[in-house]
């Protein structure tokens, strides 16, 4: 079993890297959002994107789905990158991600989706927000970010993943 690093980039953005492949969640590297009312404590510079194969977006708020950062990633990488988004009936986000030149996969709610040899994720939506449970080898992580889960959703997650490690 290979070693996997989880690194906080900033805000809700973090990277999971096994040394060969990386996935980044909710990338927002620089700039302001919400009519210039929010900014990062420190803008992110010099991120190694060479192993980036996947981007996962939790929801459509600009501090999680930051279009300028997606454009930056596309302009500064040569590899094929798959963007993973929660399933939505409205396909605007999927269509715009594809227009940027990314591949895009929608994952169905409450079902585990195998990303690669070391990672699988499941999404648990609440309205426009989503929590992700991800499994790295034999460890279970919950990324709730700003998603408020109902009691029933917590029970569903607990039933599917009896032991959350982190």
Question: What is each stretch, according to the model?
Answer:
Residues 2-45, 129-146:
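Conserved beta-strand hairpin/beta-sheet module of binuclear metal-dependent hydrolase folds
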Residues 20-55, 60, 67-72, 149-162:
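Pre-active-site segment of Zn-dependent metallo-hydrolases
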Residues 21, 76-82, 102:
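A short helix->loop->beta-strand "cap" motif at the edges of active sites that frequently abuts
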Residues 31-32, 60-65, 90-93, 111-114, ...:
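Active-site environment of divalent metal-dependent phosphoester hydrolases
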Residues 52, 73-81, 135-140:
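Short, surface-exposed connector motifs at secondary-structure boundaries
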Residues 66-76, 92-99:
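Metal-dependent catalytic neighborhoods of phosphoester/phosphodiester hydrolases
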Residues 68, 125-166:
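Active-site-proximal loop/helix segments of hydrolase catalytic cores
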Residues 85-139:
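Metallo-beta-lactamase
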